[in-house]
Amino acid sequence: MAKLGKRTRAAREAFAGKEELSVEQAVALIKSAASAKFDETVEIAMNLGVDPRHADQMVRGVVGLPNGTGKTVRVAVFARGPKAEEAQAAGADIVGAEDLMETIQSGKIEFDRCIATPDMMPVVGRLGKILGPRNLMPNPKVGTVTMDVAQAVQNAKGGEVQFKVEKAGVIHAGVGKVSFDEAKLVENVRAFVDAVAKAKPAGAKGTYLKKIALSSTMGPGVSVDVASASGN
């Protein structure tokens, strides 16, 4: 524990007094301060000027990060017949129908993304209370209810990230690993911020992108200049 304490103190000292950094500065600081014995995820938190309790202020979407996430994504697909075969051929980890529904109902959720063909939604719909809170419910708006299951599986495994605003108006996501080159992390951050910016809902009033912070899994966060985080 003493070593962990020293590393934590050192990281906090490195971050002390540093606010509103450029994306490049923030990424460099996070990479230099990362000290865990595993490849930490670089995480982004965005405070948005929305109240997601109102339907016209909900923010959700999907973005393909140019350099991937560095994470192995486990994909489940609800499909039958030829579409099930397509999903398996594309690399889906779990493929099923009612049998997969029963597995999930039993509490066994061993996947990070869930995809379904439209005809399977009556089955998937019974899992709303389980999949919904985990942001795993297939949704046509983010391309996870589709007949092109092969492409959806490839997208999920190729660095596509879904995002959805939480009750407090915050969006969290992983945008890479600390082992990534700085330039690749910067590209990923800007791609993610731009996707959220483009998903601005009609009901949003005032400042939309309010605050942005970056951190590593085990490290403290640092605030990032909003203008710097935009690729535009």
UniProtKB/Swiss-Prot annotation:
Keyword Transferase annotated? no
Name the SUPFAM superfamilies for this protein: Ribosomal protein L1
Which controlled-vocabulary keywords does the entry list?
Answer: Repressor, Ribonucleoprotein, Ribosomal protein, RNA-binding, rRNA-binding, Translation regulation, tRNA-binding
Q: Which GO terms describe its biological process?
A: regulation of translation; translation
Q: Which Pfam families match?
A: Ribosomal_L1
Q: Which GO terms describe its cellular component?
A: cytosolic large ribosomal subunit
Q: Is the keyword Nuclease assigned to this protein?
A: no
Q: Which domain of life is it from?
A: Bacteria
Q: Name one GO molecular function term.
A: tRNA binding
HAMAP family given in the database record: Ribosomal_uL1_B
Give the protein's function: Binds directly to 23S rRNA. The L1 stalk is quite mobile in the ribosome, and is involved in E site tRNA release. Protein L1 is also a translational repressor protein, it controls the translation of the L11 operon by binding to its mRNA.
Known PANTHER family for this protein?
Answer: 54S RIBOSOMAL PROTEIN L1, MITOCHONDRIAL, LARGE RIBOSOMAL SUBUNIT PROTEIN UL1M
Q: How does it assemble?
A: Part of the 50S ribosomal subunit.
Family from the record: Belongs to the universal ribosomal protein uL1 family.
Q: What is this protein called?
A: Large ribosomal subunit protein uL1
The organism's taxonomic lineage, starting at the top: Bacteria, Pseudomonadati, Pseudomonadota, Alphaproteobacteria, Rhodobacterales
Q: Which gene encodes it?
A: rplA
